[in-house]
Amino acid sequence: MERNVILAKNAGFCFGVKRAVDEAIKYQKEFGKKIYTLGPLIHNNDVVNYLEDNNIFAIELSDADSLKKGDVVLIRSHGVKESVIKDLTDKGLIVKNATCPYVTNIQLKVKKCYEQGYKIIIVGDKNHPEVIGINGWCNDSAIITNGKTELENIPAKVCVVSQTTEKKETWNKVLNEIVRASKEIVAFNTICSATDVRQKSVQELSKEADLVFVIGGKNSSNTTKLYEICKKECPKSYHIENVKELDESLLEDESVKTIGITAGASTPDWIINEVISKIKEL
């Protein structure tokens, strides 16, 4: 049956993620030995396996104690607390920083405003490594909200930033709450421009598609948010990690004429292309 398969604009690797993967490969070749990343370099199991094949391994911060002087540690795109970089360097480790420049920008804004006496509010997931890292640039003192419950006791002088992959509607909701309660507000909409474009693109795509596949790691924040946006517009939206999770029975529905494909910022082109090729085969 003839079907229309549409790939969303800006699907797949974002600038920061591609840069981190490229840096990891570059340093492995440069040093000619194992490279350690603090946590998975990106939230995609297929890419993590690819990196391991290239002698690049994820470790937890606690594992750094067992590393030897001269071992190479790469800070991933999500970034880390300011103190972590100092601690690793003090251990005699070679520290290479692949923090996404957009995240670095947030970290520096937070540090400056915190030093100027502003209470920091971060709109995002308190358990996400990016948010944990940002909080470390204001002495772990930030108020962190995901917008699901109203903020209480909002200080009079605040600086507001966002996780780069946050939904714009959540940012706007929280900011409106703060505007009603605070007298002095410095607000930086730090949602990554690529995230914003990606979210708008999938919203439009899911309006015209009968079926949507959102490709990306199940532990990927931005992929999950894309899936949530798609599900609102197209009930037949499914989050899959790769072609192995493609449920072929979904394609047997003859009412499905247009299939939308999008992918998170941690999903490489080859995984996207495998899914598209499989759909076209069926």
Curated annotation (Swiss-Prot):
Annotated cofactor note: Binds 1 [4Fe-4S] cluster per subunit.
Gene3D superfamilies recorded: 3.40.50.11270, 4-hydroxy-3-methylbut-2-enyl diphosphate reductase, catalytic domain (3.40.1010.20)
Binding site for [4Fe-4S] cluster: 14, 100, 192
Cofactor: [4Fe-4S] cluster
GO BP annotations, alphabetical order: dimethylallyl diphosphate biosynthetic process; isopentenyl diphosphate biosynthetic process, methylerythritol 4-phosphate pathway; terpenoid biosynthetic process
EC identifiers of the protein: 1.17.7.4
Pathway named in the protein's UniProt entry: Isoprenoid biosynthesis; dimethylallyl diphosphate biosynthesis; dimethylallyl diphosphate from (2E)-4-hydroxy-3-methylbutenyl diphosphate: step 1/1; Isoprenoid biosynthesis; isopentenyl diphosphate biosynthesis via DXP pathway; isopentenyl diphosphate from 1-deoxy-D-xylulose 5-phosphate: step 6/6
Alphabetic keyword roster: 4Fe-4S, Iron, Iron-sulfur, Isoprene biosynthesis, Metal-binding, Oxidoreductase
UniProt cross-references to Pfam families, sorted A to Z: LYTB
Residues bound to dimethylallyl diphosphate: 43, 78, 128, 220-222, 266
Active-site residues, Swiss-Prot/TrEMBL: 130
GO terms assigned for molecular function: 4 iron, 4 sulfur cluster binding; 4-hydroxy-3-methylbut-2-enyl diphosphate reductase activity; metal ion binding
Reactions that this protein is recorded to catalyse: isopentenyl diphosphate + 2 oxidized [2Fe-2S]-[ferredoxin] + H2O = (2E)-4-hydroxy-3-methylbut-2-enyl diphosphate + 2 reduced [2Fe-2S]-[ferredoxin] + 2 H(+); dimethylallyl diphosphate + 2 oxidized [2Fe-2S]-[ferredoxin] + H2O = (2E)-4-hydroxy-3-methylbut-2-enyl diphosphate + 2 reduced [2Fe-2S]-[ferredoxin] + 2 H(+)
Residues where (2E)-4-hydroxy-3-methylbut-2-enyl diphosphate binds: 43, 78, 128, 164, 220-222, 266
Transmembrane segments: none
Ligand binding (isopentenyl diphosphate): 43, 78, 128, 220-222, 266
Function of the molecule: Catalyzes the conversion of 1-hydroxy-2-methyl-2-(E)-butenyl 4-diphosphate (HMBPP) into a mixture of isopentenyl diphosphate (IPP) and dimethylallyl diphosphate (DMAPP). Acts in the terminal step of the DOXP/MEP pathway for isoprenoid precursor biosynthesis.
The family this protein is said to belong to: Belongs to the IspH family.
NCBIfam families: ispH_lytB, PRK01045.1-1, PRK12360.1
Name of this protein: 4-hydroxy-3-methylbut-2-enyl diphosphate reductase
Organism: Clostridium perfringens (strain 13 / Type A)
